[in-house]
Each structure stands twice: as structure tokens, then as C-alpha cells.
């Protein structure tokens, strides 16, 4: 179950700060409890710590690259991770805004840039102001957040994975599902068939890797995207930069070729393809 709205989030950084402050016999500590969105003052005690009128135990066991949330039902901090058919995990970054992993595969860039700032640059490519936008694979919502900040008229965002939606409910960097952002739990390959022709001004397509969701790279899906997109509308398709020598595939060029066959002009930009409907 999702945590309460005022649940603190901890990483190894904050936990180590708490232990160091306790060892130094400090009374208070300034630290972040929301993945660097803000700073809070907590009270440091010998056996627990206090924040917002509540007391919490010190997590005695913790790992790097893990976000911990307070689970009231367990009376303990638990990893922000779920396992169903795959392991889905929220992963902290040095930038504050987290990425996430599915079975150990990182879903958002974070090695050289904040995944939140990376989303800003990609959303700028489709020029969101006053547009109706389809966000095919909502993920943690960073594309949607920047569309809203960029003045989009309406953002229709799809996310099929309930585990990802649960992570999104925990993540303070994820936007609220409130107008002009509409978040729908549905398979976008099915949903797109029901959308009206020429009903969107721009599209953001950030699918999982080809090996996980090949249907989101298919010519038939791209043709549906072309159908619902108005003429001269923009589509940004994230492909990543897979090593074609080790993977045996040149995914960006394969994507660009299929998009052209679907009726787009294409240009490779960074780790994706910017396409314009002819």
C-alpha cells in the first residue's frame, strides 16, 4: 500500500547523517526527507528520531541505491520496491529526483544528468505550450510534469504497470494527476486505437527497452500514432543509446526507419528521435 502523504523518505545518505549526528550527540539535524525537494529539521534522540510530531526508529539495516519509506502497518522503514512478475524499484540519484528499475534495468537516464532535467530538455523538443499532448508511457511522470509547466492545454498520460503507479504515489518529484494532466492506467497500444484521428498536437513516447515491450516499437503502433497526430505535429521517441556491437541491433536507426514508413520525417537528437508528421 502507498505510504501516508507525510511519510518521510530516506536513502543511505540521510540515514548515515542521522547516525553521525547521534554519535556526535547533536540535538537536531537539517536533512531532506523528500529526496531533496526540501530540507527539514529533525530531532535526534538516543534510540529514535522525531519529525512532524512523530517518532521513528533508526533503520539499522540499509543498502545503497534504495529509497526507504515508512510503512505504518509494519512499524518500520521498507524499500520502495514491489515484486509481481518483475521487480520494480525506486532508485535514488545524486540529483534528488529518482529513477526506477525493472528487473535491474534502469528506466531513466541518471548517470550524467538529473532524470527530471533530462525530461525537461526532451519535452522542450515538442514545444508543449497550448497543445494537447499524448504521453504514451507515463512512468514517474516527469514528461507530464514538464508539459504542465510548459503550458500544455491537456496531457493524456498512460501507464499500464500498477507497480510503477505505486512508485509514482511515493515519489515527491512525480506530478499530481490533476488537470491539465490526466493519468490513465491502461495499455496504450489498445487505448490509442480508440483516440480520434488528428486529436493530439504532440506525442511523447518513452517506452521500456525493445526486449521488454517490442509492441511499442512496431510499425502498426507508429501508424496509429501518426493517425491521431495532426499534420506537422511533433513526436519525440526515446530510444536510448544501446551498443549495437553488443546488442546486435541498431535500435535508433530501426526506429527512425519505421517512423518514416509510418509517415514521419525523422531526425536523431541525443538519445532519441524527433519525428514530424508529414
Please tell me what each predicted stretch does.
Residues 113-130:
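Conserved alpha-helix/loop element of class I SAM-dependent methyltransferases that forms part
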Residues 140-152:
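Conserved SAM-binding loop of SAM-dependent methyltransferases across substrates and taxa
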Residues 1-93:
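N-terminal auxiliary segments of SAM/dcSAM-dependent transferases
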Residues 217-231:
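A short glycine-rich, Lys/Arg-flanked "PGG" loop and its adjoining helix->strand segment in the class I
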Residues 232-240:
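Conserved beta-strand signature within the Rossmann-like core of class I S-adenosyl-L-methionine
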Residues 241-278:
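Class I S-adenosyl-L-methionine
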Residues 158-197:
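S-adenosyl-L-methionine
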Amino acid at each position: 500500500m502507498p505510504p501516508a502523504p507525510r511519510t518521510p523518505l530516506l536513502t543511505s545518505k540521510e540515514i548515515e547523517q542521522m547516525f553521525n549526528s547521534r554519535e556526535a550527540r547533536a540535538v537536531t539535524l537539517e536533512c531532506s526527507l523528500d529526496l531533496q525537494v526540501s530540507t527539514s529539521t529533525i530531532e535526534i534522540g538516543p534510540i529514535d528520531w522525531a519529525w512532524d510530531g512523530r517518532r521513528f526508529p533508526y533503520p539499522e539495516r540499509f543498502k545503497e541505491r534504495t529509497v526507504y519509506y515508512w510503512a505504518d502497518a509494519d512499524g518500520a522503514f521498507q524499500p520502495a520496491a514491489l515484486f509481481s512478475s518483475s521487480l520494480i524499484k525506486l532508485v535514488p540519484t545524486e540529483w534528488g529526483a529518482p529513477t526506477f528499475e525493472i528487473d535491474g534495468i534502469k528506466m531513466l537516464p541518471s548517470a550524467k544528468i538529473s532524470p527530471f532535467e533530462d525530461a525537461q530538455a526532451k519535452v522542450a523538443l515538442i514545444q508543449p505550450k497550448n497543445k494537447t499532448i499524448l504521453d504514451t508511457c507515463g512512468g514517474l511522470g516527469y514528461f507530464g510534469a514538464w508539459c504542465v509547466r510548459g503550458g500544455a492545454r491537456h496531457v493524456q498520460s498512460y501507464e499500464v504497470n500498477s507497480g510503477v503507479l505505486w512508485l509514482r504515489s511515493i515519489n515527491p518529484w512525480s506530478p499530481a494527476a490533476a488537470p491539465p494532466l490526466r493519468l490513465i492506467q491502461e495499455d496504450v497500444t489498445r487505448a490509442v486505437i480508440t483516440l480520434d484521428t488528428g486529436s493530439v498536437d504532440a506525442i511523447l513516447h518513452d517506452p521500456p527497452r525493445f526486449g521488454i515491450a517490442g509492441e511499442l516499437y512496431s510499425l502498426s503502433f507508429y501508424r496509429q500514432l501518426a493517425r491521431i497526430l495532426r499534420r506537422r505535429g511533433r513526436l519525440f521517441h526515446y530510444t536510448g543509446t544501446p551498443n549495437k556491437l553488443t546488442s546486435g541491433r541498431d535500435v535508433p536507426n530501426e526506429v527512425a526507419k519505421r517512423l518514416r514508413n509510418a509517415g514521419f520525417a525523422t531526425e536523431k537528437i541525443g538519445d532519441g528521435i524527433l519525428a514530424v508528421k508529414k
